[in-house]
């Protein structure tokens, strides 16, 4: 499930402008050589994170998913949940609703309030927010935390869906990591944009035409 076409297109342009999305030849976590690379860690300033949060908020609103709060898995999800909660508070579609958020620590704190959770109590329908889904480990841990608190995972919200089949080349899964998460936990995965939106840019904008063939070949081999 992706955001509206206009939101997705604007986000792809934004990611390019920020150097977060690049074309070339990159060895990615799976070991594959990818003709593009998306590094959300380069959203690293107040302005860029503020804009990113606006895209997350819009994608969540566009999705129509019913939710009560946000959860950001450590570590990448922490600033994403925080900033997106702020963006939602100012979104006109939220009508002044104040969305709480929480996140976890990697290690339990043994002083003060203690525990591994920080922020609002986990209650109701919870949206897990992260940058991408690679193996689904972060989502699994988040779902366990949310359910252990008596709350309900409502959706996973990510920046980019690579639409890429999981597994080694000689044993490719018929599904992507995103599809596996949706099937395993029975919740939607909402993305701001996807590889399909990147392909639309490559097809529509002549300045990126040189990368079109390589990305299309990669998608044909690994895409879903």
Curated annotation (Swiss-Prot):
<dbReference type="GO" id="GO:0046132">
    <property type="term" value="P:pyrimidine ribonucleoside biosynthetic process"/>
</dbReference>
<feature type="binding site" description="in other chain">
    <location>
        <position position="29"/>
    </location>
    <ligand>
        <name>5-phospho-alpha-D-ribose 1-diphosphate</name>
    </ligand>
</feature>
<dbReference type="GO" id="GO:0006207">
    <property type="term" value="P:'de novo' pyrimidine nucleobase biosynthetic process"/>
</dbReference>
<keyword id="KW-0328">Glycosyltransferase</keyword>
<feature type="binding site" description="in other chain">
    <location>
        <begin position="75"/>
        <end position="76"/>
    </location>
    <ligand>
        <name>5-phospho-alpha-D-ribose 1-diphosphate</name>
    </ligand>
</feature>
<feature type="binding site">
    <location>
        <position position="109"/>
    </location>
    <ligand>
        <name>5-phospho-alpha-D-ribose 1-diphosphate</name>
    </ligand>
</feature>
<feature type="binding site">
    <location>
        <position position="111"/>
    </location>
    <ligand>
        <name>5-phospho-alpha-D-ribose 1-diphosphate</name>
    </ligand>
</feature>
<keyword id="KW-0460">Magnesium</keyword>
<dbReference type="InterPro" id="IPR000836">
    <property type="entry name" value="PRibTrfase_dom"/>
</dbReference>
<feature type="binding site">
    <location>
        <position position="162"/>
    </location>
    <ligand>
        <name>orotate</name>
    </ligand>
</feature>
<feature type="binding site" description="in other chain">
    <location>
        <begin position="130"/>
        <end position="138"/>
    </location>
    <ligand>
        <name>5-phospho-alpha-D-ribose 1-diphosphate</name>
    </ligand>
</feature>
<comment type="pathway">
    <text>Pyrimidine metabolism; UMP biosynthesis via de novo pathway; UMP from orotate: step 1/2.</text>
</comment>
<dbReference type="GO" id="GO:0000287">
    <property type="term" value="F:magnesium ion binding"/>
</dbReference>
<protein>
    <recommendedName>
        <fullName>Orotate phosphoribosyltransferase</fullName>
        <ecNumber>2.4.2.10</ecNumber>
    </recommendedName>
</protein>
<dbReference type="InterPro" id="IPR023031">
    <property type="entry name" value="OPRT"/>
</dbReference>
<feature type="binding site">
    <location>
        <begin position="37"/>
        <end position="38"/>
    </location>
    <ligand>
        <name>orotate</name>
    </ligand>
</feature>
<comment type="subunit">
    <text>Homodimer.</text>
</comment>
<dbReference type="InterPro" id="IPR004467">
    <property type="entry name" value="Or_phspho_trans_dom"/>
</dbReference>
<keyword id="KW-0665">Pyrimidine biosynthesis</keyword>
<dbReference type="GO" id="GO:0005737">
    <property type="term" value="C:cytoplasm"/>
</dbReference>
<comment type="function">
    <text>Catalyzes the transfer of a ribosyl phosphate group from 5-phosphoribose 1-diphosphate to orotate, leading to the formation of orotidine monophosphate (OMP).</text>
</comment>
<feature type="binding site" description="in other chain">
    <location>
        <position position="106"/>
    </location>
    <ligand>
        <name>5-phospho-alpha-D-ribose 1-diphosphate</name>
    </ligand>
</feature>
<feature type="binding site">
    <location>
        <position position="105"/>
    </location>
    <ligand>
        <name>5-phospho-alpha-D-ribose 1-diphosphate</name>
    </ligand>
</feature>
<dbReference type="GO" id="GO:0004588">
    <property type="term" value="F:orotate phosphoribosyltransferase activity"/>
</dbReference>
<keyword id="KW-0808">Transferase</keyword>
<comment type="similarity">
    <text>Belongs to the purine/pyrimidine phosphoribosyltransferase family. PyrE subfamily.</text>
</comment>
<dbReference type="InterPro" id="IPR029057">
    <property type="entry name" value="PRTase-like"/>
</dbReference>
<dbReference type="Pfam" id="PF00156">
    <property type="entry name" value="Pribosyltran"/>
</dbReference>
<feature type="binding site">
    <location>
        <position position="134"/>
    </location>
    <ligand>
        <name>orotate</name>
    </ligand>
</feature>
<dbReference type="GO" id="GO:0044205">
    <property type="term" value="P:'de novo' UMP biosynthetic process"/>
</dbReference>
